[in-house]
Design a protein with these regions (language model features):
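Hydrophobic/aromatic-rich alpha-helical bundle segments in the mid-to-C-terminal region
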Residues: 16-19, 143-161
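Active-site acidic catalytic loop and adjacent metal/ATP-binding pocket
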Residues: 44-90
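Glycine-rich, phosphate-binding/catalytic loops in enzymes
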Residues: 76, 93-95, 156
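Active-site activation/catalytic loop segments of kinase-like enzymes and analogous catalytic loops
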Residues: 89-121, 133-150
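Non-catalytic, C-terminal membrane-associated alpha-helical segments of glycosyltransferases
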Residues: 132-141, 157-161, 165
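Regulatory N- and C-terminal appendages and interdomain linkers associated
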Residues: 166-173
Length: 173
């Protein structure tokens, strides 16, 4: 997945400009947070607008639900309705968010490391935090519907896994 994303980000295309989906004025630790301090630190970090140091063509909803697989090989990426030009960390962070809530912070960090190796670019921790903060209470409601029993899902552990990945990113600063 990280290799495909590096290839997408290498495309030289013009498209609509990036607009953040994150409403900073509405950010707060999730109600079930056990580490509100981690959330507050992450929220404080992204309080000010930041200009990306690098932009590229983005999928904008890059995650395994939008990938086509054949014999354990990634063969395509679907759902390009939100594609735009913006910081590559938005795609990386969105995929990492999904990998974290569904699996673990370790899996999300492995994805980032492979992406960095494949793309030749280090993921800016600020943009990573910015995108990871898209997580909220609605994730525990819509993911079970999206998964629809096709795989095990630990809804109660999602926020804790997000706290772990945020803490790991904040240590990278």
């Amino acid at each position: 997945m990280a290799q495909m994303l590096a290839r997408i980000h290498a495309l030289d295309l013009d498209d609509k400009p990036f607009e953040s989906w994150l409403d900073r004025s509405q950010l707060s630790p999730p109600p079930d947070a056990s580490r509100a301090d981690v959330w507050r630190e992450a929220i404080a970090l992204v309080a000010e607008e930041r200009v990306p140091t690098r932009t590229c063509f983005l999928h904008r909803d890059y995650q395994h639900f939008n990938m086509l697989w054949s014999r354990e090989r990634l063969t395509g990426v679907v759902d390009w309705s939100e594609a735009c030009i913006g910081p590559p960390e938005v795609d990386v962070g969105h995929c990492r968010l999904n990998l974290t809530v569904l699996f673990s912070a370790v899996v999300a960090d492995r994805f980032r490391a492979i992406y960095e190796a494949e793309s030749g670019h280090r993921v800016d921790a600020w943009w990573d935090v910015h995108t990871l903060l898209s997580y909220g209470p609605s994730w525990t409601q819509f993911l079970p519907i999206q998964i629809d029993g096709r795989a095990p899902l630990d809804v109660e552990g999602m926020t804790g896994r997000m706290e772990e990945v945020l803490e790991r990113v904040l240590r990278r600063l």
